[in-house]
UniProtKB/Swiss-Prot annotation:
Keywords: Acetylation, Chromosome, DNA-binding, Isopeptide bond, Methylation, Nucleosome core, Nucleus, Ubl conjugation. Its main location: nucleus. Monoubiquitination of Lys-122 gives a specific tag for epigenetic transcriptional repression. It comes from the Eukaryota. There is a cross-link at residue 122 (Glycyl lysine isopeptide (Lys-Gly) (interchain with G-Cter in ubiquitin)). It comes from Gallus gallus. The lineage of its organism: Eukaryota, Metazoa, Chordata, Craniata, Vertebrata. The keyword DNA-binding applies. This is Histone H2A.Z. The modification N6-acetyllysine is found at residues 5, 8, 12. Variant histone H2A which replaces conventional H2A in a subset of nucleosomes. Nucleosomes wrap and compact DNA into chromatin, limiting DNA accessibility to the cellular machineries which require DNA as a template. Histones thereby play a central role in transcription regulation, DNA repair, DNA replication and chromosomal stability. DNA accessibility is regulated via a complex set of post-translational modifications of histones, also called histone code, and nucleosome remodeling. Residues 89-100 are annotated as: M6 cassette.
Length: 128
């Protein structure tokens, strides 16, 4: 066998590596999420392969939802940059996100709200 190339890879074309995020069509890193899931589990690192893909898809969807609502809030206020205030308005303005995200957002301010009993009717005026 002098001079010839022999081995497992002889004659095969090498394919480019495709990440699990690309296979799943996601932007969030499936491999990194899988690593974090394995490091935080109690069953000695046993996490299914699809668990990381599913978790990454959920995180990506929730992030896109919050960013879309925050972008709408910033457009309503005629600014081009999303601030913590816009995130706060977006999350507290949506009933489902409000029940899901209970965290306090630093720099988010408060949500304006006036109770209905405090609002006077149009025909009434206060007498002194």
């Amino acid at each position: 066998m002098a001079g010839g190339k022999a081995g497992k890879d002889s004659g095969k074309t090498k394919t480019k590596a495709v990440s699990r995020s690309q296979r799943a069509g996601l932007q969030f890193p499936v491999g990194r999420i899988h690593r974090h899931l394995k490091s935080r589990t109690t069953s000695h690192g046993r996490v299914g392969a699809t668990a990381a893909v599913y978790s990454a898809a959920i995180l990506e969807y929730l992030t896109a939802e919050v960013l879309e609502l925050a972008g709408n809030a910033s457009k309503d206020l005629k600014v081009k940059r999303i601030t913590p205030r816009h995130l706060q308005l977006a999350i507290r303005g949506d009933e489902e996100l409000d029940s899901l995200i209970k965290a306090t957002i630093a720099g988010g301010g408060v949500i304006p709200h006036i109770h209905k009993s405090l609002i006077g009717k149009k025909g009434q005026q206060k007498t002194v």
